[in-house]
Design a protein with these regions (language model features):
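Conserved, short, structured surface segments that act as functional micro-motifs
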Residues: 157-209
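Short, glycine/small-residue-enriched coil/turn segments at secondary-structure junctions
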Residues: 60-61, 91-125
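Residue-level recognition of beta-strand microenvironments
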Residues: 73, 123-124, 151, 168-171
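Zn2+-dependent peptidoglycan hydrolase active-site motif and core
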Residues: 114-149
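Envelope-exposed proteins and targeting segments
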Residues: 66, 97-99, 108, 116, ...
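Short, acidic/hydrophobic/Gly-rich beta-strand patch recurrent on exposed beta strands
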Residues: 101-104, 132-137, 184
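Short, well-structured beta-strand-loop connectors
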Residues: 112-121, 153-168
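Polar/charged, compositionally biased leader and regulatory segments
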Residues: 1-99
């Protein structure tokens, strides 16, 4: 009798295990049947914050406060003869067209600001032009700041519009201006008159240049 019960118990356990195995196999088969091939699974893209995303809508601002004055303008051939003469730079016996705008404040130092957001691609001390910082913006536009002092940025830094990048300093090339900022706007490696592009968006500057 005990042997019969033992055999029945083993049979019960075996049958139960077999039943559970078959049920599990059926569930797995159903899951596998409903699986989609890898290439059929839609890819969900996650947008990341891009600091340069809105640069195109920024307007180009002057790199100085309103109390800082223009001491020498850009040599623009559309100007009259008097202004063209004023936009010449005399150095070592030669007159050269001014490729930017020079700002002064009665020989006082003043803060210099990033005209638009971008990346610092150059920080260099030039023997004639003094300390130079170049910021690259979108659309092939660069702003260049020469004759700087007390520079606050390094090459590779991401700067936002209005960040202080340094102070006005001195250089050899325009030593008669004493403390000043020489500011250049370059589009596709060509210098342009900054006055024509202030208060325009970066996007518009590129399309109209």
């Amino acid at each position: 009798m005990k042997g019969l019960l033992k055999r029945n118990k083993k049979t019960f356990i075996f049958m139960t295990s077999l039943l559970l195995f078959l049920i599990g196999a059926g569930v797995i088969q159903e899951i596998v049947k409903n699986l989609k091939p890898f290439e059929d699974v839609p890819v969900v893209s996650v947008e990341t914050k891009d600091e340069n995303k809105n640069q195109g809508s920024e307007i180009l601002k002057k790199p100085v406060n309103d109390d800082v004055k223009v001491s020498k303008g850009f040599y623009d051939t559309s100007l009259d003869d008097k202004k063209l003469e004023e936009a010449l730079v005399y150095f070592e016996g030669v007159y050269r067209p001014n490729d930017g705008i020079d700002y002064t404040k009665d020989n006082e130092s003043f803060d210099v600001y990033a005209s638009a957001s971008g990346t610092v691609i150059r920080k260099e001390n030039d023997s004639l032009l003094g300390w130079i910082v170049t910021i690259e913006h979108q659309k092939g536009i660069q702003t260049i700041y020469q004759s700087l002092d007390d520079i606050k940025v390094e090459k590779g830094d991401q700067v936002k519009q209005g960040d202080v990048i340094g102070k006005a300093g001195n250089n050899v090339y325009q030593s008669t201006l004493k403390k000043h900022l020489h500011f250049i706007v370059s589009i596709d490696d060509k210098t342009v008159n900054p006055d024509k592009y202030f208060n325009q968006t970066i996007e518009k500057i590129k399309t109209t240049s």
